[in-house]
Amino acid sequence: MISIGTDLVHISAFAEQLAQPGSSFMEVFSAGERRKANERQASRYAEHLAGRWAAKESFIKAWSQAIYGQPPVIAEEAVVWRDIEVRADAWGRVAIELAPELAAVVRESIGEFSSSLSISHDGDYAVATCVLTIQ
């Protein structure tokens, strides 16, 4: 079985959210994701993180689709977003890496799975698609 999730993020609105005084939104990103974003030019910082946010959302949507007709395994407000980490290899190809606890919960709900991820940016938008292949 294959399950697909896609998310679209408006980069300008996302940047405003990041810049709000007292915002804790950066906490949704892992230390590694924040470090990689800080390596970008200031003008591309929000763009980079918007793509990562879209990727995290696309994973949740793909997982949710995989359990269609069943109640959610984790309430939306209980998701620990930094447990869904977007990593890139030396050539910039991205992948989802789940914290061990979350990976166990996902496996318990859908069985063994693998994921594929794509992130793209165009103008003021970032989009990500996650495909879960369930064995």
Swiss-Prot record:
Annotated EC: 2.7.8.7
Residue stretches spanning the membrane: none
Top EC class of this enzyme: transferase
Entry annotated with the keyword Metal-binding: yes
Molecular function per GO: holo-[acyl-carrier-protein] synthase activity; magnesium ion binding
GO BP, one annotated term: fatty acid biosynthetic process
CC terms in the record's Gene Ontology section: cytoplasm
Keyword Metal-binding applies: yes
Binding-site positions, Mg(2+): 7, 57
Function text: Transfers the 4'-phosphopantetheine moiety from coenzyme A to a Ser of acyl-carrier-protein.
Family: Belongs to the P-Pant transferase superfamily. AcpS family.
Name this protein carries in UniProt: Holo-[acyl-carrier-protein] synthase
